[in-house]
């Protein structure tokens, strides 16, 4: 969690009441400043990006004699970040840092480091952090601004780099909160090094670093993998006795999950009942953790009950929430209830998100109900839904399973278009099933075009080339092009 400090704004950087004025001006254009000045701010937030650089727009506002507040700048940068326009947000941060009238806070430094990593990569992020460490002016904030770099290592599972950074931070005396230790525990769990999680906890105890709720939850998960249920229960008892933390629904869910994985279903059910009593009536998050765990227990009554109660929480129910409850109902085998919930979602959705319909589509295909799947797919298209790679993957599996290969081939061609814009790739089994169909039907032209497409996408394999070579040999055709593709693929 990035540590926030109050930044000091000086001279013309007025910080009073600007946020409300900015929101008003961006919403209805009622700001009292000049149209040109107002437009310079709106230009930054243009959906397709500003026509001019962010720095020139900000400088124009300053040069025209108008005040720019830190609150104003932060509000704009947050909106840019929310829409994943990290490069524009970084331009703003760089401009702010170069202004003599702004004193950067810990929050600003950490945010800039995070944006550098997101925009330019880890190498530049590392260089910026090193610059902070060797700057006497910024050394005081570097102590709290290292987390984005550590989190980037964790996200990319860069164990050695994360360990080296932790060693450096320890030598500088920076490790005084549980946050970096929690990040290391996440990294070790993600890389399957559960014993090291326990070592991190021992290090925290040795250095008198307090554990927080996340520390205990990660520790319990690791103990389950290393030592079993008894060790997890010991950690949980220690947590209950730790007056600095409050045991909430998240820790009880962690404990329940351990019991489920270890086959102690009744213990898990009792823990989940206690967790239900601790749910926050102003936030849905906990409800869906419990819904998922009830589904793992095969308890469809628990899934439905929590789902209905979650509706009383204020705020719009998101597509992610619907995906969670639909997946849980499908997992418990209650397709009828899943269809009812899906109809409920369809009746209120503004934008048709195919990730929701894909849950039901996958259930139909797995149950061998291909006609239902096709009917649902048709309805999705009518409602304006745009199939994604997962939609086509599900349908291809269904069509291959019921030997409707022409439809599977059409779907694969749709997938070829999508693969130019995403990292997903179809399974080897589906790829080979279509190739084997071409061989069986002696469709050598289609097979050759198919393999060429796969070759361009880097998906051609030795079994695929062997199949095509067999077809060419059988048809007594030259295979120079095939050998050339194999050579390029180093096969």
UniProtKB/Swiss-Prot annotation:
This is Pentatricopeptide repeat-containing protein At5g27460. Pfam families: PPR (PF01535), PPR_3 (PF13812). The lineage of its organism: Eukaryota, Viridiplantae, Streptophyta, Embryophyta, Tracheophyta. Transmembrane segments: none annotated. GO terms for molecular function: mRNA binding. PANTHER family: OS02G0796400 PROTEIN, OS12G0527900 PROTEIN. Keywords: Repeat. Belongs to the PPR family. P subfamily. Gene3D superfamilies: Tetratricopeptide repeat domain. The keyword Cell membrane does not apply. PPR repeats lie at residues 69-99, 105-139, 142-176, 177-211, 212-246, 248-278, 283-313, 318-348, 353-387, 388-426. It comes from Arabidopsis thaliana (Mouse-ear cress).
């Amino acid at each position: 969690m990035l540590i926030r400090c109050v930044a000091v704004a000086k001279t013309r950087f007025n910080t009073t009441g600007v946020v409300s004025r900015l929101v008003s001006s961006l919403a209805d254009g009622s700001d009292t400043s000049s149209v040109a000045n107002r437009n310079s701010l709106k230009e930054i937030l243009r959906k397709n990006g500003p026509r001019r650089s962010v720095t020139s727009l900000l400088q124009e506002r300053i040069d025209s004699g108008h005040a720019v507040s830190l609150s104003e700048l932060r509000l704009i940068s947050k909106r840019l970040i929310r829409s994943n326009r990290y490069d524009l947000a970084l331009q703003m941060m760089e401009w702010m840092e170069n202004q003599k009238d702004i004193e950067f806070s810990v929050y600003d430094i950490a945010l800039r480091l995070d944006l550098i990593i997101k925009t330019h990569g880890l190498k530049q992020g590392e260089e910026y952090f090193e610059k902070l460490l060797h700057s006497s002016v910024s050394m005081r904030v570097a102590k709290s601004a290292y987390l984005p770099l550590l989190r980037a290592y964790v996200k990319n599972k860069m164990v050695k780099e994360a360990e080296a950074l932790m060693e450096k931070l320890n030598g500088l005396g920076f490790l005084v909160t549980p946050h970096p230790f929690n990040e290391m525990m996440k990294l070790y769990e993600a890389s399957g090094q559960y014993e090291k999680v326990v070592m991190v906890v021992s290090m925290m105890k040795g250095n008198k670093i307090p554990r927080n709720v996340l520390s205990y939850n990660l520790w319990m998960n690791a103990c389950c993998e290393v030592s079993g249920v008894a060790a997890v229960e010991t950690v949980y008892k220690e947590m209950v006795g730790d007056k600095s933390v409050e045991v909430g629904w998240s820790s009880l869910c962690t404990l329940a999950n351990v019991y489920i994985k270890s086959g102690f279903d009744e213990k898990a059910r009792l823990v989940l009942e206690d967790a239900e009593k601790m749910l926050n009536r102003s936030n849905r998050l906990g409800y869906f953790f419990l819904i998922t765990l009830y589904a793992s227990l095969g308890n469809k009554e628990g899934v439905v009950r929590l789902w209905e109660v979650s509706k009383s929480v204020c705020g719009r129910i998101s597509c992610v929430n619907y995906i969670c409850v639909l997946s849980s109902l499908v997992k418990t085998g209650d397709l009828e209830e899943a269809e009812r919930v899906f109809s409920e979602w369809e009746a209120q959705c503004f934008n048709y998100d195919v990730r929701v319909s894909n849950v039901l589509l996958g259930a139909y295909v797995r149950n061998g109900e291909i006609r239902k799947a096709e009917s649902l797919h048709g309805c999705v298209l009518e409602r304006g839904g745009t199939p994604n790679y997962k939609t086509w993957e599900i349908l291809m599996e269904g069509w291959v399973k019921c030997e409707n290969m022409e439809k599977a081939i059409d779907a694969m061609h749709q997938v070829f278009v999508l693969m130019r814009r995403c990292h997903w790739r179809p399974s080897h089994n589906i790829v080979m099933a279509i190739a084997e169909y071409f061989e069986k039907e002696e469709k050598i032209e289609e097979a050759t075009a198919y393999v060429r497409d796969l070759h361009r996408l880097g998906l051609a394999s030795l079994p695929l080339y062997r199949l095509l070579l067999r077809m060419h040999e059988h048809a007594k055709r030259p295979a120079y092009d095939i050998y050339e593709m194999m050579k390029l693929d180093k096969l």
